[in-house]
């Protein structure tokens, strides 16, 4: 078995979907290990645009089996809505998408509570997507949540869901406008529809290992949103790095062939939290406009700033990348000069690494190196050496600083707008 992992190296929205799509065409199985439909990316294939949230993008490859792993959380109505949208675009999904019976279920009550918890936080709000991901992982960790396997025992399902609803009702009182009977009734219809998709993931992937299948793992969110190694508390509720891959899927570390970090050529972030290289000026506005930086899941404009190599190096220290996919290089085509963050200082002292304390992170001074822009279009370039020398210098600076080869370079939105270096 040969496993390739594609992970976001920044705060998400790096453009993981394009490389995942390319690699999925070489894979027999494509997996999601963690997260839910709070993730989002777009793939352009054969002139058709597909939006993915909870579903693995390997569905674009008709020969690829797709697995939503045990570490994921699934809102069942959204799962079917996304499937239907893909099928309307001509994708045939029958027999190619499966959900682990150990994955936890996101209910409407989780989504309602998500919003109420943001209100509770007041000025300290996280900027959640409102998809119920955090509350679902919370019930998972308190061992009160429901897994996919629980949905098929009506008595267990009803008792557990009522218990969750009762707990939230005690906490939020009249603020919670939730009808538990309505959701219980809805699953009477969904149960039979869902049954063909739910499987025991462990023998499925064990069989793939015996057959020496090529497996692609598609990371959701990104390392800086990791519950342990990201900018806590402004993070998601799962392990978004390599650790989440190992625990969310029964794939041993010895099966890993390549761990690819996807790095946007500048930095973006959605929601709240410290962002040291953010540009609240014409530079940030230009990146936002030219890069069409609007979230696929939330529709929110992304905050934009210079490439932060302190972030990328921290990400590499956590995930041990074997290669980097640099994306959206073309968005920087019209800049006279480019800055890259190389270190932070706090109270006059240079910091050794990426600070855990968000209060410190919000106050750091950023040290930059300035590199010349190339002022030439890169879109459509297919050979690395056809790029302007300044563009190559930018790429090679990143390689040297992080210590990882940039193997793929995105130079446009289409699937074939990708330079591959040997």
Swiss-Prot record:
Needed co-factor(s): Mg(2+)
GO molecular function: adenylosuccinate synthase activity; AMP binding; GMP binding; GTP binding; magnesium ion binding
Enzyme nomenclature, EC number: 6.3.4.4
Keyword annotations: Cytoplasm, GTP-binding, Ligase, Magnesium, Metal-binding, Nucleotide-binding, Purine biosynthesis
Enzyme class, first EC level, given as a word: ligase
InterPro entries: Adenylosuccin_syn_GTP-bd, Adenylosuccin_syn_Lys_AS, Adenylosuccinate_synth_dom1, Adenylosuccinate_synth_dom2, Adenylosuccinate_synth_dom3, Adenylosuccinate_synthetase, P-loop_NTPase
Any GO CC annotation of this UniProt entry: cytoplasm
Entry binding sites for substrate: 296-302
UniProt xrefs under NCBIfam families: PRK01117.1 (NF002223), purA (TIGR00184)
Protein name (database record): Adenylosuccinate synthetase
């Amino acid at each position: 078995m040969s496993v390739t992992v594609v992970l976001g190296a920044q705060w998400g929205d790096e453009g993981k979907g394009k490389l995942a799509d390319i690699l999925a065409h070489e894979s027999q199985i494509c997996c999601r290990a963690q997260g839910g439909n709070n993730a989002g990316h777009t793939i352009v294939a054969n002139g058709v645009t597909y939006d993915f949230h909870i579903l693995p993008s390997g569905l674009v490859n008709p020969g690829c089996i797709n697995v939503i792993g045990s570490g994921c959380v699934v809102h069942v109505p959204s799962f079917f809505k996304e499937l239907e949208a893909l099928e309307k675009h001509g994708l045939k999904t029958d027999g190619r998408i499966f959900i682990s019976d150990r994955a936890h279920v996101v209910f409407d009550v989780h989504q309602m509570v998500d919003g109420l918890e943001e209100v509770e936080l007041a000025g300290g709000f996280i900027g959640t997507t409102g998809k119920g991901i955090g509350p679902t992982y919370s019930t998972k960790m308190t061992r009160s949540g429901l897994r996919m396997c629980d949905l098929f025992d009506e008595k267990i399902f009803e008792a557990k869901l009522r218990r969750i609803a009762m707990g939230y009702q005690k906490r939020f009182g009249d603020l919670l406008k939730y009808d538990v009977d309505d959701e219980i009734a809805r699953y009477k219809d969904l149960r039979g529809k869902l049954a063909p998709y739910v499987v025991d993931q462990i023998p499925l992937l064990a069989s793939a290992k015996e057959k020496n299948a090529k497996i692609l793992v598609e990371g959701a969110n990104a390392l800086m949103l990791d519950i342990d190694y990201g900018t806590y508390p402004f993070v998601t509720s799962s392990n978004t790095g390599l650790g989440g891959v190992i625990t969310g899927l029964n794939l041993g570390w010895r099966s890993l062939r390549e761990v690819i970090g996807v790095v946007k050529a500048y930095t973006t972030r959605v929601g709240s939290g410290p962002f040291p290289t953010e540009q609240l000026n014409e530079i940030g506005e230009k990146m936002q406009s030219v890069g069409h930086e609007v979230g696929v899941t939330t529709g929110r404009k992304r905050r934009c700033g210079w490439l932060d190599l302190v972030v990328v190096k921290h990400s590499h220290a956590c995930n041990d990348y074997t290669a980097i996919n640099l994306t959206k290089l073309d968005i920087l085509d019209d800049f006279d000069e480019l800055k890259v963050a190389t270190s932070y200082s706090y109270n006059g002292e240079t910091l050794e690494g990426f600070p855990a304390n968000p209060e410190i992170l919000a106050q750091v001074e950023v040290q930059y190196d300035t590199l010349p822009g190339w002022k030439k279009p890169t879109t459509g370039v297919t050979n690395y050496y056809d790029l302007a020398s300044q563009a190559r210098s930018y790429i090679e600076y990143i390689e040297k600083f992080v210590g990882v080869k940039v193997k793929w370079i995105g130079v446009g939105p289409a699937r074939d707008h990708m330079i591959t270096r040997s």
